Amino acid sequence: GFGHTRLEGPAVDSYWFPDYMADLDALLDHYAGERKVDLVGHSMGGNIAMMYAGVRPQRIEHLVNLEGFGMPETRPAQAPGRYAQWMDEIKTVQRGGKALKSYADADGVARRLMKTNPRLSEDKAQWLAQHWARPNAQGLWEILGDPAHKITSAQLYRVDEALAIYERITAPALAREASGDSL
């Protein structure tokens, strides 16, 4: 997550989607042991929750998916271009080209959040800004994210594979999609 999982060590070039499921598995091992859990995910987290619930159905009591409905279908012919794009984006990140924007203060972060989501109230944006960013050594507020998350995956999304995993979900599931579009 943002801000609470920073580790010292070498930078990561990119992330592989199954790593997120393995991270979730480790978190559940640590915090829930053998107990079943209620799992809620939003957007990419909803995709992770759905995949995890199908791969480890015995661990999930209830599943809530908020706007995590997979990705567009891909075709094998897209693979060469996708791998080239992935390699190019890794080089860009290594040169600092995908660095996350810095802000003069927490208010700037809050304004950025409200611009992205006009329905977000100022008090909620201020609260999020304090948890989503922190000041660096120069006093600028940096988003607590890893630019490597912005890299396009080299792997193509396989809808048939995802559907086969979804078929294994045994927990009662609730899926929700927003009715408004603020973009």
Regions found by a protein language model. Give the residues of each.
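Conserved serine/cysteine hydrolase catalytic core
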Residues: 133-183
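Conserved hydrolase catalytic core segment
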Residues: 34-80
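A catalytic-pocket lid/entrance helix-loop region that shapes and gates access to the active site
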Residues: 66-101
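Helix-loop "lid/cap" segments that line or gate small-molecule binding pockets
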Residues: 94-99, 108-120, 131-133, 150-154
